[in-house]
Design a protein with these regions (language model features):
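Phosphate/dinucleotide-binding and metal-coordinating scaffold of catalytic cores
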Residues: 1-168
Length: 168
């Protein structure tokens, strides 16, 4: 079971690409809050290492057991930063948090790197990685009502752009 508290979060990382023949546990990413900033470590699962994959997915992650820590000059491993949203996606997530806070009559909380990573709607996520907060839990983010990015908004944008094209 994943541990999640005010000080640490354990994220189950799954690889999901055709060559694997299905979703495969790759390992666990741990985010620990240290002096107001998250420090990340990653440990490959025993199964992933036993598969004998020679694929180096991040130059800062070597294929061996045990925790490996992200470099101080990086907010996370590049592999996971690639799965996180860009600047605009982060703005959308901050707006979603503000809306949620208003609905729950509380102050918006400051989002951390792990919140951005886990906040991308699973079905819209780019790349071959998927994430859970427990081994038997759902892939996240799975909130259909507040998906980031909101696909309905993209359709509205498409319609507006088509109207502009037709005016010419």
């Amino acid at each position: 079971m994943a541990k999640q508290s005010g000080h640490s979060k354990e994220i189950w990382v799954y690889a999901d690409w055709v060559e694997l023949g299905g979703t495969t546990l790759m390992g666990t990413l741990k985010a620990e809050l240290v002096r107001g900033r998250e420090v990340f470590s990653f440990a490959y699962s025993k199964e992933w290492l036993e598969k004998g994959s020679e694929l180096l997915l991040d130059p800062d992650l070597r294929l061996y057991g045990g925790p490996q820590y992200s470099r101080e000059d990086k907010p996370n491993f590049g592999l996971f930063l690639d799965s996180s949203p860009d600047r605009w996606g982060r703005v959308l997530m901050e707006r979603r948090e503000a809306l949620k806070a208003r609905q729950e009559n509380r102050k918006p909380r400051t989002l951390m790197e792990s919140d951005y990573l886990m906040g991308v709607f699973d079905r819209y996520r780019m790349g071959g990685l998927r994430f859970k907060l427990s081994e038997d839990g759902p892939f996240l983010d799975n909130n259909d009502a507040m998906a980031a990015p909101p696909m309905a908004s993209l359709r509205t944008l498409e319609a507006a752009s088509l109207q502009l094209e037709n005016k010419d």
